[in-house]
């Protein structure tokens, strides 16, 4: 994993106005990059039309390689990332429960109980380039999200397709 000058993080890992107990990146806050350094958010850029945050600027502490500070300071959050120089766009399909109730067979029409959010398709996801290597296998863990299987029949070399097969426990929902 190569840390370069431009990284991608999950949108949920940054907040311009964080709530209490938010242990991820925010203006003036320091977090640990998983397998990397401590970084501190110095500024961010928003899209003038939508207000959406499109860039987060940070400084890093070169003395914290490996995620530990020689001065003993601690950070409360660790976020994962992917280097912009070492990633590709992918389509990711997230599956949820098919029905909105536990026993759909007890209803007159089970079709009324289908969960409209049982499939979420996420396009333009960033994944490491290793997924393009045919010798790397077809099953991957995407940190904090779960285990995914590469769809070699419906995906493409340019934009691989992944299906989530198992979720991980959501420790962020506490």
How should each PLM-predicted stretch be described?
Residues 1-3:
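Short, small-residue-biased leader/transition segments that mark boundaries at the very start
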Residues 24-25, 32-34, 49-51, 134, ...:
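A structural signal for short secondary-structure junctions
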């Amino acid at each position: 994993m190569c840390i370069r000058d431009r990284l991608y993080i999950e949108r949920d890992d940054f907040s311009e106005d964080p709530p209490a107990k938010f242990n991820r990146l925010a203006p003036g806050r320091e977090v640990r990059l998983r397998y990397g350094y401590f970084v501190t958010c110095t500024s961010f850029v928003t899209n003038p039309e939508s207000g959406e945050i499109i860039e987060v600027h940070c400084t890093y502490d070169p003395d914290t390689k490996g995620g530990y500070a020689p001065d003993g300071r601690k950070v409360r959050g660790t976020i994962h990332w992917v280097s912009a120089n070492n990633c590709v766009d992918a389509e990711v399909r997230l599956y949820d429960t098919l029905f909105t109730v536990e026993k759909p067979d007890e209803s007159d029409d089970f079709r009324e109980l289908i969960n409209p959010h049982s499939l979420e398709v996420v396009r333009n996801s960033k994944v490491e380039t290793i997924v393009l290597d045919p010798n790397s296998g077809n099953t991957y863990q995407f940190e904090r999200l779960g285990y995914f299987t590469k769809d070699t029949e419906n995906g493409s070399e340019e934009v691989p397709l992944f299906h989530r097969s198992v979720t991980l426990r959501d420790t962020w929902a506490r």
